[in-house]
Design a protein with these regions (language model features):
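Cofactor-pocket helix-loop regions in the catalytic cores of large enzyme subunits
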Residues: 1-396, 405
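Segments forming glycine/polar-rich beta-alpha architectures that bind adenosine-containing cofactors
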Residues: 399-413
Length: 413
């Protein structure tokens, strides 16, 4: 969902918080795997249903999620869920449920947006493709359209689904209010933290893109002698670059010991492969360099949850043998490559302070990610850090971090 959020809001910001589960009237869960992969979230939803009377509407692929307790379960093929949401958006527009005032004040709508939506997502076409009757689908849409506080839970990997969900919430004004927001679930506990510090190939650190201004600011902040000038490679593109010789060295940081097939192929093909991993892999003995790192329960640092909550992760067990933190390993590799001055870190708190200061650097309010309050944090204070959420209630005044202050509806395929 990172690309969709950046395109719609102007910044990769999650509008929701877990407290919105209790504040909502209706939770629309898209995909049964969300309940299975996020048991704490599932327990929270169950408590909200029992204590607050929150309704749960589950959109699940045929045969999936049959054991999930929901007020209503709708079977829709996985590859048609984005179309189902787009049909809901068109129905809201055609029946006058979209928030015209909110759209006029706070959202830019492409000239042909509604025309394109009308030709591709009419009630009958969506019903036929999803295996539902038009009468049944209209009743479902009517039921959802009149609920003012809706939280939509969805997986962030499907960009088409993310665009449809975000468009629905923007067009109906169900955003920037307690209990009303799109909520993309991250696959990893620190998924948002990784995006904030620039681990996605599509952006720079601290929610900066590859604009000339952003690159100049980061170059000054880091006193960088060389800076990336455009998005990097990801997934299959990275494997292709290894095969054709554009990439000669690869550093892999693995936390669960399970590398995807494309990464294993890349590590086998690259001349220099370095793996920071807590797991021994007999199949890879003698192939590349393996550096022992901390497993999840041995890690020590901060992480950012899906709802912008920064919390302190403390090591449960001492590091065994020669194992070191991943950040320390990256620092040593960088120093060995000749970048000693840029990688001077000796403590995890130093990295946190630098990240905090970078979010505030040249930030006059154009970006919501601003951790300025922690810029002077000391090492002892870092050790005692308690959870805190940045961004308060994003977009509550209808303003977005775009040049004109307006969000954007995203064209749907």
């Amino acid at each position: 969902a990172a690309l969709a959020q950046r395109a719609a809001y102007g910044e990769d910001v999650m509008p929701a918080a877990y407290e919105d589960i209790e504040r909502a009237e209706l939770i629309l869960m898209i995909g049964a795997d969300l309940a299975q992969d996020h048991p704490v979230l599932n327990a929270r939803i169950a408590a909200a249903r029992a204590d607050q009377g929150v309704e749960l509407l589950l959109l699940a692929a045929p045969g999936e999620g049959t054991s999930i307790e929901a007020d209503l379960r709708i079977e829709v093929p996985r590859d048609r869920m984005a179309s189902w949401i787009a049909g809901l958006l068109r129905h809201c527009h055609d029946t006058g449920v979209t928030d015209g005032d909110y759209l006029a004040r706070n959202v830019s709508v492409p000239d042909d947006f509604w025309a394109q939506l009308r030709t591709r997502h009419d009630l009958w076409s969506v019903a036929r493709s999803c295996g539902l009757s038009p009468v049944e689908l209209r009743a479902l849409y009517d039921r959802i359209a009149v609920v003012p506080r809706i939280v939509t839970l969805f997986g962030g990997a499907d960009e088409g689904l993310a665009r449809a969900v975000i468009d629905f919430h923007l067009a109906t004004g169900r955003i920037g209010r307690p209990g009303a927001a799109p909520f993309a679930m991250t696959a990893a506990a620190n998924g948002m933290g990784g995006r904030e510090v620039g681990c996605n190939a599509s952006g720079l650190a601290a929610h900066r893109g590859f604009t000339a201004e952003a690159m100049a600011e980061i170059t000054r902040f880091w006193s960088a002698e060389a800076m990336a000038t455009g998005p990097g490679l990801d997934g299959a593109e990275l494997a292709d670059a290894v095969r054709d010789g554009r990439i000669r060295a690869l550093l892999s940081i693995s936390g669960d010991g399970i590398d995807p097939a494309w990464l294993r192929a890349a590590l086998d093909a690259v001349p220099l492969a370095i793996r920071s991993t807590p797991w021994a892999d007999p199949e890879r003995d003698g192939r590349g360099i393996a550096l022992p790192s901390a497993s999840w329960v041995e890690k020590d640092g901060t992480l950012t949850g899906a709802d912008r909550l920064i919390s302190r992760q403390r090591r449960l067990f001492p590091l065994p043998g020669e194992a070191k933190p991943d950040w320390w390993i990256v620092t040593q590799v960088a120093r060995a490559m000749g970048w000693q001055a840029a990688f001077h870190y000796e403590w995890a708190a130093e990295i946190y302070r630098e990240h905090v200061r970078l979010t505030a650097y040249c930030n006059d309010g154009a970006r919501l990610l601003n951790l300025r309050r922690h810029a002077p944090i000391s090492n002892p204070a870092y050790e005692e850090l308690t959870p805190w959420r940045w961004g308060e209630l994003p977009f509550d005044e209808g303003r977005f971090p775009t040049p004109d202050g307006r969000a954007r509806l995203l064209p749907l395929s």
